[in-house]
A protein has these predicted regions:
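Active-site-proximal beta-alpha core segment in soluble small-molecule metabolic enzymes
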Residues: 1-106, 115, 136
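C-terminal active-site-proximal or functional interface alpha/beta core segments in diverse enzymes
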Residues: 74-166
Length: 166
């Protein structure tokens, strides 16, 4: 979550060969004219310069496989959120690979795909969301030679809330 955690991790238990860092692009995250959330106010995640520095340091410490994680908005009821987030992280992954020579093994799109809490709201179409992520993957990662990157998700609210659990 924070570049200062690298030294703490190293001192506490050593640096593993596989690690994931959280990215915070800062500013406001919006789709169209709707502001979805304000990652700039979040206390978690590294800025772009910080994540580049962190990956450089971690590579020197022996990390072989990197992951990227980001959480930009909560409970979005929009089929565009996940594909937009995926595009941001896929482009960052390509930049990190090309500039630092690191291997990005996985990207965690986290959560944020929500549910409508009132009957007048349209629910997310998970198939449209998946198709948008697939399209971004094929347009950004595959041409960069990164077609082996795994995608992780955390869709707890989307999967469980309609059944009375959260």
């Amino acid at each position: 979550d924070d570049i200062t955690h690298i030294d703490f991790l190293k001192d506490a238990c050593g640096i593993p060969e596989r690690i994931c860092c959280r990215y915070n692009p800062g500013g406001y995250f919006s789709l169209g004219t709707d502001i979805m959330d304000n990652p700039g106010d979040a206390k978690y995640g590294m800025t772009k310069p910080q994540i580049f520095e962190a990956f450089k340091r971690l590579k020197r410490e022996g990390v072989k496989e990197f992951g990227i994680h980001s959480f930009l908005a909560s409970n979005t009821v929009s089929n565009e959120y996940y594909p937009a987030l995926a595009s941001i992280l896929f482009n960052l992954a390509v930049e990190l690979k090309e500039n630092l020579g690191v291997h990005i093994g996985f990207i965690n799109l986290s959560g944020g795909v929500g549910i409508p809490y009132t009957p007048d709201k349209e629910p997310n179409d998970i198939f449209a969301i998946g198709e948008g992520v697939r399209k971004a993957y094929e347009e950004i990662l595959v041409p960069a030679g990164m077609g082996d990157v795994k995608i992780f998700t955390e869709l707890g609210r989307f999967m469980l809330a309609p059944h009375g659990h959260l």
